[in-house]
């Protein structure tokens, strides 16, 4: 349903504009080409220049314009540029046009046709031209060949050329899908990395077109040149996977400790060395096909339109079939091998004749084909890589899907589910930490009956809501975008050495697991939930920024019951203070109150939850008496026991995790921009800002910087005066201060600062044991 909705949306919003854009090249060719022998050269040059413009547009749109202007203003800019082009075209149309195609051939005897037929500029002129040619053919003796078609290849050869035109579009777009998937295994997958690959492909296609424009000047047989180009492109494709493995050290993540610009240059270099040779050579094929069209051309625009139509249909089918069928059925390496095979078969089928040169060319094609199938078979290459820092990690199972590559790995820390080699969705080794993402908000709001989880991953967090300790939970709905992740979770997380880590998520009648885009589901459904719980999302990954936008927070708020809350988990070890502040400012703009809660107290690995509350909400009171448990937990302990403390966790002591009221301290975030769908600053700034740090001073908001931020928030709005805590007792409202002191003690302990550790420990004990 979601896919069908997206297809309808794209068809209605983009089809009309793309249809009109598709007329540009044929119409320009009709205007510019006045010499039959120059058709191939000029058409290829036009195509190359046009594609260079596309590369420049992709670079600007991928790296700068959305951040500078926003998507809406960028679209307006594109419209203005299109109108300027239209105005320029209108002015050119006022100039007089030549009436005939000029020929560079030597004059023929009078009994032959000395001039090329008139250039048809309108439908009426084309029909008149066809009638005139038919009349000439009827008057010409049967043994006298036509001057226009005498050098034309046979009909079978023309069909082979049209098939190659289709394959050129099919192959290049299918390969772009495969190349993107290939590099998603080794890149951080921000919006910039995908833009880099697109720009490289477009630049190579443009350069290939310009090269083919030069080749069109040669007097060599066009079919021989075309065969050699296809053969060279196939050879480059065979080498691509092996070059990729060499440059990425067997698919290890490509990273740089330098600046953002040095990282982008590293990506450009790695991607260019890997895919540029094949993209450049294959990029010459379609433009050079225009050289073979010279013998058949009656109208430049008509010929260009025909070739472009066939090529574009191939491109559409290539992207669709590769993205939805080939990757699922064959995987990345076998799909690339099949596409290479198609190019080699096409080279063999081109009608070169049976002279020695042609036979040698076909023999070389056969040799390359055998090398592709056996000697350099890419199917033996690894599909994903394992973490070199993980001890004895091994791959258990892999799913190559249209969205991503999903793998289950096993190491000494447990069984993990990963996406694209390096993005971990969770592990059995982090069972308690993942389960706490459900437990913490349910301890704050123990009367919760219905929950929505945006993201399933291992299923541990969503399944945690079904724990018997949460007696009031009646409904859990969880959405996961990647179906193979659900498959992996069902297979490996429900029976981990006989234990169901998902808490019965896939068989409990209260739970519903959907393969759906969670954001879109919240926008479309009419269901209401007491808690909407959004999982951790890496902010600098492409697409993740949309889950931190004002519009998403607004649609989530609409899906809450009157007393419901929205919970957004944030991995501070992947956020700078800039990104955290942007997200906080955006949530403050949407929700009446926003509070911050710690997930853990481990310096360097901090996670927080930002909870959006609706108007008039306060935290519910708790009548649990935890006094004895609190005293027992610290009895006889000192700072050396910081890592071994077993503090009680219940709805009364949960305020120990409370970081503060961000709305009351909104002055700290007012200077930061909002993150919106129109201007997704998170998605475009995060990959840049986190590279501003150094190895000595990491940029993340963890450790002391985070503790300092909490101190600022609690100074502006002390827990004793926090409007969210009015239902709590005076001593209970001192628990957030105990949490802050405990976190500070952990930080100083890691620094081996004994005096500061003791001071923070004393403050922790004071606040932890405080009474009215």
Where do the protein language model's features map onto the residues?
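Short, solvent-exposed mixed-charge patches
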Residues: 515, 771-772
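Alpha-helical transmembrane segments of multi-pass membrane proteins
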Residues: 1-617, 622, 626, 735, ...
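SAM/dcSAM-binding transferase cores
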Residues: 618-750
């Amino acid at each position: 349903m979601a896919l069908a909705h997206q297809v309808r949306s794209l068809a209605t919003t983009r089809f009309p504009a793309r249809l009109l854009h598709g007329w540009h090249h044929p119409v320009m060719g009709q205007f510019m080409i006045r010499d039959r022998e120059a058709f191939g050269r000029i058409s290829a040059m036009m195509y190359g220049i046009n594609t260079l413009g596309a590369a420049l547009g992709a670079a600007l749109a991928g790296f700068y314009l959305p951040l500078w202007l926003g998507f809406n203003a960028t679209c307006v800019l594109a419209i203005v540029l299109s109108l300027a082009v239209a105005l320029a075209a209108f002015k050119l149309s006022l100039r007089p046009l030549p009436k005939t195609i000029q020929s560079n051939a030597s004059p023929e005897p009078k009994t032959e046709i000395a001039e090329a037929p008139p250039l048809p500029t309108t439908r009426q002129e084309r029909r008149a031209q066809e009638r005139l040619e038919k009349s000439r053919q009827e008057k010409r003796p049967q043994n006298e060949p036509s001057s226009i078609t005498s050098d034309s290849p046979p009909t079978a050869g023309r069909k082979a050329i049209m098939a190659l035109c289709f394959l050129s579009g099919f192959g290049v777009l299918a390969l772009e899908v495969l190349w993107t998937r290939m590099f998603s295994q080794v890149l951080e997958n921000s919006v910039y990395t995908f833009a880099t690959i697109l720009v490289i492909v477009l630049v190579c296609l443009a350069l290939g077109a310009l090269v083919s424009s030069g080749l069109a000047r040669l007097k060599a047989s066009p079919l021989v040149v075309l065969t050699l180009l296809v053969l060279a492109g196939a050879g480059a494709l065979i080498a691509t996977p092996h070059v990729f493995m060499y440059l990425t050290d067997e698919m290890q993540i490509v990273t740089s400790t330098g600046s953002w610009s040095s990282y982008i240059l590293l990506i450009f270099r790695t991607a260019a060395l890997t895919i540029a040779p094949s993209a450049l050579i294959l990029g010459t094929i379609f433009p050079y096909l225009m050289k073979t069209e010279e013998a058949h051309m009656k109208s430049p625009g008509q010929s260009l339109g025909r070739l472009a139509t066939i090529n574009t249909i191939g491109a559409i089918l290539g992207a669709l079939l590769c993205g939805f069928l080939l990757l699922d059925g064959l995987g990345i390496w076998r799909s690339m091998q099949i596409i290479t095979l198609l190019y080699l078969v096409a080279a063999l089928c081109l009608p070169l004749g049976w002279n020695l040169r042609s036979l040698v060319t076909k023999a070389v094609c056969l040799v390359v084909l055998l090398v592709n199938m056996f000697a350099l078979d890419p199917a033996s290459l690894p599909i994903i890589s394992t973490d070199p820092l993980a001890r004895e990690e091994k791959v258990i199972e892999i799913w190559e899907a249209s969205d991503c590559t999903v793998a289950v790995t096993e190491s000494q820390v447990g069984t993990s589910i990963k996406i694209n080699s390096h993005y971990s969705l969770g592990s059995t080794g982090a069972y308690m930490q993942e389960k706490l993402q459900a437990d913490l908000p349910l301890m704050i709001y123990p009367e919760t009956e219905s929950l929505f989880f945006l993201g399933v991953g291992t299923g541990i967090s969503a399944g945690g809501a079904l724990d018997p300790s949460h007696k009031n939970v009646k409904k859990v709905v969880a959405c996961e975008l990647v179906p193979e992740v659900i498959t992996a979770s069902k297979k490996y997380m429900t029976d981990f050495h006989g234990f169901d880590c998902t808490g019965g998520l896939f068989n409990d009648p209260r739970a519903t697991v959907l393969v759906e885009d969670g954001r879109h589901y919240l926008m479309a459904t009419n269901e209401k939930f007491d808690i909407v719980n959004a999982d951790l999302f890496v902010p600098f990954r492409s697409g993740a920024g949309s889950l931190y936008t004002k519009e998403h927070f607004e649609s989530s708020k609409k899906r809450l019951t009157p007393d419901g809350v929205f919970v957004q988990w944030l991995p501070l070890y992947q956020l700078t203070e800039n990104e955290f502040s942007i997200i906080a400012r955006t949530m403050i703009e949407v929700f009446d109150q926003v509070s911050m809660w710690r997930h853990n107290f481990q310096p360097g690995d901090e996670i927080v939850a930002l909870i959006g509350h609706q108007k008039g909400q306060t935290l519910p009171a708790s009548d649990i008496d935890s006094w004895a448990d609190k005293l027992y937990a610290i009895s006889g302990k000192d700072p050396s026991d910081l890592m071994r403390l077993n503090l009680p966790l219940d709805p009364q002591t949960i305020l120990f995790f409370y970081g503060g009221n961000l709305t009351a301290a909104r002055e700290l975030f007012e200077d930061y921009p909002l993150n919106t769908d129109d201007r997704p600053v998170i998605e475009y700034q995060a990959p840049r800002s986190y590279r501003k740090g150094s190895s000595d001073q990491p940029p993340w908001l963890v450790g002391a910087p985070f503790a300092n931020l909490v101190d600022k928030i609690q100074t502006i709005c002390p827990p004793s005066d926090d409007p969210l805590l009015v239902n709590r007792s005076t001593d209970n409202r001192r628990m957030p201060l105990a949490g802050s002191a405990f976190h500070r003690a952990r930080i100083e302990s890691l620094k081996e600062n004994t005096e500061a550790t003791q001071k923070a420990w004393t403050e922790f004990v004071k606040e932890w044991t405080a009474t009215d």
